[in-house]
Amino acid sequence: MADDSIVGAWELVSDSRVGVSIYTDSHFSTVMAAKNRQRSSGERATPDEALEALLTCQAVSGTYAVSGSTGTYTKVANTRAETSDQPIVGNHTINGDTMTFNIRSGGSSTNAGASLTWSRVPSVGTDTPLIGAWELVDD
């Protein structure tokens, strides 16, 4: 079971990117994108615009475990097929409602050494049936 202090929703604190990361006690889902992403020039994106949209919006989900300050993330689904077999490993620091994650390995070679700062999203209550984690299953 993961460290309960990480469970919840977090927003990326960054001048250049936006992002949301959601943690349950065993799973995570993260989406990040550049703040200055180009919109398509028309109602429908051109092939080049569609590729650029995909490359500038990173999405990853899977399972994770925290041991001490080390977080290890195993990807179940992500937008970077070339990194699918690489777990993400890094150091977590949580101070109040701020979490910092320093990537040691995994992700892509350009992410090693990167530091991400997240701010906890306040809870708004539990009076909706949608609260929780949902896994897509085939019929």
Predicted regions located by residue number:
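Lipid interaction determinants
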Residues: 1-139
